[in-house]
Amino acid sequence: MKDRRIFKRGFVYYADLGYNYGSKQSGYRPVLVLQNNIGNKYSNTLIVAPITTRDKKILPTHVYVGDKYGLDNDSIVLTEQITTIDKSRVFEYICYIDNNAMKMVEKALITSLGISSCACDMLYNSSNELHRKRIN
């Protein structure tokens, strides 16, 4: 059965990330939806970044969002730990992260994924053309 909830980029939910090894975030925790809204509407999965309240070593892939958005504690988005989860593992809506914070998250993602600024400019300027091209 298709999940009928509406998921939007920038929304924060509680989700079950399951059990993971090592330093990867796991368990029931807040996650930030990163995936575009078309993917959110039609896919059975979501691309998310886990959020932690633990003090972490300051990295360029971390975005401090505090507690001003409705999060219970001072929080950090961990863009170096993005993951894809099934919508059935997503539970309670918590809050929405505003555009300014999402821009900071986007910059952290660019850093995390090693995408150069000129590559980003090229993608933004030709995104419609890229969708039309078929890769053989």
Question: Which role does the model predict for each range below?
Answer:
Residues 18-22:
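Short, charged beta-turn/beta-strand-edge "cap" motif at the junction between a beta-strand
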Residues 69-136:
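C-terminal terminal-subdomain/extension
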Residues 26-28, 33-67:
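Compact nucleic-acid interaction/catalytic patches
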